[in-house]
């Protein structure tokens, strides 16, 4: 009996959310809205720019690298603005430029992101700070720059591109994972600062996207544990999902692919089960084959081989100690040593 009741409750809740999405707040209007995308010169950002341009919207891209006309990353019709989004002064200065030359930005897509793929102790302070500035702090800068205009015209949409790794971060992604977790928290706080989502009088909506692994250079070399359960996502497909969401005025969160909806639950289960999930999914060791966004590939490969050699050497040494101790124990001359798994890292 409980099954049909829960099914009915789920359907009624979904119907309510769909009605509220269409009834309250804005719907995307390409003739009226100006879209600004950070990190829009490549990867997902470039596909988002292409999608909105194809719908006849006005699109501005903030990126530290501006693609040359005629190259693969260049999208005809996009207004490219060279801007280091990790630099607060540049963001505020270029926001004023866009305001004066293009118009009032009513859709902000915070997409810029970088990663280093190193152990925390191997990260320099500059690399840590740069990752947090580009991935997290830049969203604070752009929201501070453009949200007042949205509130003034009672029309706006702020889309935050986070990641499933903001819920479950692997080793060697401490700064990246922390930045994506921060984006999720930023989205939640901002959403309720703007008012109750279903009866929002500010006119500004928020949307959070938490995709799985994208098929881009950022995570080049990182294998996916299953092409069926955890497939690499095509940026073009993700951009289409984002456009479809804003077209119908969606708010809340989008987690793709399917496993993205399960990842947050891992944090609430007993740790042995969570550890088993990490092991079976391969997430704990996934970044060992990372080659994207690095100029130290040779050094990292050498370092990985050195680490492996050290571990093997230590295991052999431990095995020898145990063998000697067993022999001595048989003769009753010594106790067996206690070996902690923490001795081998």
Put a short name on every predicted segment:
Residues 111-116:
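Conserved NAD(P)H cofactor-binding loop of Rossmann-fold oxidoreductase domains
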Residues 194-259:
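SDR active-site lid
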Residues 22-58:
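Canonical Rossmann dinucleotide-binding motif of NAD(H)/NADP(H)-dependent dehydrogenases/reductases
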Residues 143, 179:
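Active-site helix of classical SDR
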Residues 119-120, 124-129:
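Substrate-binding pocket helix/loop in short-chain dehydrogenase/reductase
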Residues 163:
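Residue(s) in the substrate-gating loop at a strand-loop-helix junction
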Residues 83-93, 125:
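The beta1-alpha1 cofactor-binding region of Rossmann-like NAD(H)/NADP(H)-dependent oxidoreductases
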């Amino acid at each position: 009996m409980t099954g049909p009741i829960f099914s009915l409750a789920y359907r009624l809740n979904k119907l309510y959310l769909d009605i509220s999405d269409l009834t309250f707040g804005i719907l995307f209007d390409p003739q009226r809205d100006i879209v600004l995308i950070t990190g829009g010169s490549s990867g997902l950002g470039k596909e988002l720019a292409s999608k909105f341009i194809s719908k006849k919207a006005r699109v501005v891209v903030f990126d530290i690298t501006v693609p040359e006309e005629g190259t693969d990353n260049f999208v005809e019709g996009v207004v490219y603005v060279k801007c280091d989004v990790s630099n607060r002064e540049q963001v505020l200065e270029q926001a004023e430029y866009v305001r004066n030359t293009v118009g009032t930005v009513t859709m902000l897509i915070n997409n810029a992101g970088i990663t280093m793929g190193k152990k925390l102790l191997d990260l320099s302070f500059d690399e840590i700070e740069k990752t947090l500035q580009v991935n997290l702090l830049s969203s604070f800068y752009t929201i501070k720059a453009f949200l007042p205009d949205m509130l003034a015209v009672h029309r706006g949409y702020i889309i935050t591109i986070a990641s499933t790794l903001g819920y479950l971060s692997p080793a060697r992604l401490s700064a990246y994972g922390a930045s994506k977790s921060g984006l999720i928290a930023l989205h939640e706080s901002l959403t309720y600062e703007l008012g109750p989502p279903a009866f929002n009088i500010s006119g500004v909506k928020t949307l959070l996207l938490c995709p799985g692994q994208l098929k881009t250079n950022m995570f080049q070399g990182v294998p996916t544990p299953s092409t069926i359960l955890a497939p690499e996502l095509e940026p073009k497909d993700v951009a289409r999902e984002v456009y479809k969401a804003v077209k119908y005025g969606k708010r809340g969160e989008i987690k793709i692919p399917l496993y993205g909806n399960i990842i947050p639950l891992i944090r609430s289960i007993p740790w042995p089960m969570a550890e088993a999930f990490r092991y079976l999914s391969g997430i704990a060791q996934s970044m060992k084959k990372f080659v994207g966004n690095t100029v130290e590939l040779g050094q990292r490969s050498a370092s990985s081989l050195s680490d492996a050699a050290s571990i093997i050497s230590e295991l052999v040494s431990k095995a020898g100690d145990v063998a000697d101790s067993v022999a001595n124990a048989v003769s009753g001359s010594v106790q067996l040593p206690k070996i902690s798994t923490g001795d081998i890292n």
